[in-house]
Amino acid sequence: DYFDPKLKTEGIKLNISNWRRPAPNTIPWDSKAAGLYMICTLSKHEAERQGYSESLMLDHEGNVAESTSANIFFKDEKGEFHTPIADSFLNGITRQTVIEIAKSMNIVVHERKIKPEELSTFVGCFLTGTAAEITPVSQIAENKYKVCDRILNLSESYGKLVRKKKAA
């Protein structure tokens, strides 16, 4: 597992990186091999030095982008999900799959620009990625989130789908 399995139910903690993702016109951002690993590695190591598991990356405009290794989603009080528009980071296969699963569960998904100031308005948060699968987030900087049933149910649905594909 990418994160400690215990954290899959408790949630991980993220800081907010001082480094930003570069502007889309400066690097081929929609590829894993685009050379962005250095910024993400520096950010993750700094987060770990501060006692966090991960780091939230902002884009070149200061909007929420993703973590150093996974895409990010937020849950609002109505139970709807919000995720940044994939215009400066890789639109991961896990992210796309989670959006499809959420919609099949009648969960509204908003793909939009998310300002860091909005982090305090959300009640839930989770990361998605090949290694992370669906990992709940309990805190970003001073903002705390609940690991709720909606996120755990989504994680269970994703796990069933992945295991079914692996068995086929």
Model-derived regions, located:
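Helix-start/capping segments and mature chain N-termini
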Residues: D1-A168
